[in-house]
């Protein structure tokens, strides 16, 4: 029987993360080659930059550019782009300040053609578990998105977000998962409504050499409460959803020309067929470490 490639990719990514959790307590490090501290050799999540948060506590700046091709059945088609800068500051070995959402949003469609500011969101991450021998880390976080952005670009929606993440290393192979839940607080006035939602994000990368790692990521978004607008902007804008999940897959890479600099890019595409804003997406970002 012919398998759907989207289902195969999703199952493979899920299997990798399930294996990471299952074997976190085993002695997997006996024959591994430890090249550097785990946070120095893994690739931080590239796609869904607002919500795919790993378990590592670092200090870095991450410029991000995202370009979307919007399908014709959403807002008449067109494109949207986001330009932003994320900041992460290590407070202690287990606490990190995360400024994960800001920037400038440009939406160009026949139905909506506007430019404006994103909402601003920030939070605290707590790395509550770390086992260096097993190459396993886990963290939790709490963040708040302030209704500071422009309604004309589908922002101005305040929300409370909680997340949980886990990461596991198998030598040069690294896998990770993040789970989020977001509650709309009702203090903003977004143009197309608000919603409560949960999301999950799977990541795997392989260190080919100290300069290069390919990666695969899968992102899923599920609305749990919201008005019945028949499409979802996932992590792009404040648009409600009628309950249909949005799942995307991505392939990409990271290049590390210097120890303190990583350059990344990924191409993202839908794995579900609901009417969402994922025609396809290109994410380009860098990580400047301090």
Walk through the language-model features, giving the residues of each.
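Transmembrane beta-barrel domains of Gram-negative outer membranes and organellar outer membranes
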Residues: 24-290
């Amino acid at each position: 029987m012919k398998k759907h490639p989207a289902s195969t990719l999703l199952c493979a990514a899920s299997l990798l993360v399930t294996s990471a959790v299952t074997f976190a307590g085993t002695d997997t490090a006996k024959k591994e080659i430890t090249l550097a501290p785990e946070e120095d050799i893994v690739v931080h999540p590239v796609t869904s930059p607002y919500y795919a948060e790993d378990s590592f506590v670092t200090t870095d700046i991450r410029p991000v550019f995202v370009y979307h091709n919007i399908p014709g059945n959403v807002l008449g088609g067109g494109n949207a782009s986001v330009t932003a800068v994320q900041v992460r500051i290590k407070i202690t070995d287990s606490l990190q300040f995360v400024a994960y959402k800001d920037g400038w949003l440009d939406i160009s469609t026949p139905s909506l053609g506007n430019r404006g500011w994103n909402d601003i969101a920030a939070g605290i991450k707590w790395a509550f578990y770390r086992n260096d021998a097993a190459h396993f880390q886990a963290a939790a976080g709490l963040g708040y998105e302030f209704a500071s952005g422009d309604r004309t670009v589908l922002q101005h929606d305040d929300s409370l977000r909680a997340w949980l993440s886990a990461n596991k290393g198998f030598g040069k192979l690294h896998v990770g998962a993040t789970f989020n839940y977001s509650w709309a607080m009702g203090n903003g006035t977004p143009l197309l409504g608000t919603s409560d939602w949960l999301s999950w994000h799977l990541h795997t990368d392989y260190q080919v050499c100290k300069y290069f790692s390919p990666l695969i990521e899968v992102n899923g978004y599920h609305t749990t409460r919201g008005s019945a607008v028949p499409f979802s902007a996932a992590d792009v804008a404040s648009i409600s959803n009628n309950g249909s999940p949005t799942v995307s897959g991505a392939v990409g890479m990271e290049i590390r020309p210097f120890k303190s600099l990583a350059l990344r890019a990924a191409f993202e595409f839908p794995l579900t067929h609901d009417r969402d804003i994922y025609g396809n997406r290109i994410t380009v970002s860098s990580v400047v470490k301090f």
